[in-house]
Amino acid sequence: MKTIEVVAAIITQDGKVLCVQRGEHAKEYISLKWEFPGGKVEFGENREDALVREIQEELAAEIHELQYLMTVEHSYPDFHLTMHAYSCTLKTGEITLQEHVDMKWLTPEKLNQLDWAEADLPLLESLMDLS
């Protein structure tokens, strides 16, 4: 099974966490699911640089104060995901969705109200435990 290495940003602002919703996808298990923004680590790229690049591409925003949180391993039906999560803050205040269909800022205790991608659930639980 193919393994994909990705990074995810837990962006916080005023006690709330940024959540983004994927668009419709042929793979039902990720279609319209909520997730933390991020994406694939490219060959030769370190994780922090990958996350900064992905947030620029997906949200047209800059992040800083990256702090490693945890790594999640999750097997979907046709690939294995290794996801490295970092907490961070926005350097710029504006977000423009480039790839997602919706976004919400939620307090940690309200995160479980959304329909999350399975790989993000351990992050969700960790954030809710910290609140």
Task: Label the predicted regions.
Residues 62, 72-94:
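Active-site-adjacent beta-strand/loop module that shapes the phosphate/pyrophosphate-binding cleft
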Residues 1-18, 40:
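Conserved N-terminal beta-strand and adjoining loop/helix that marks the start
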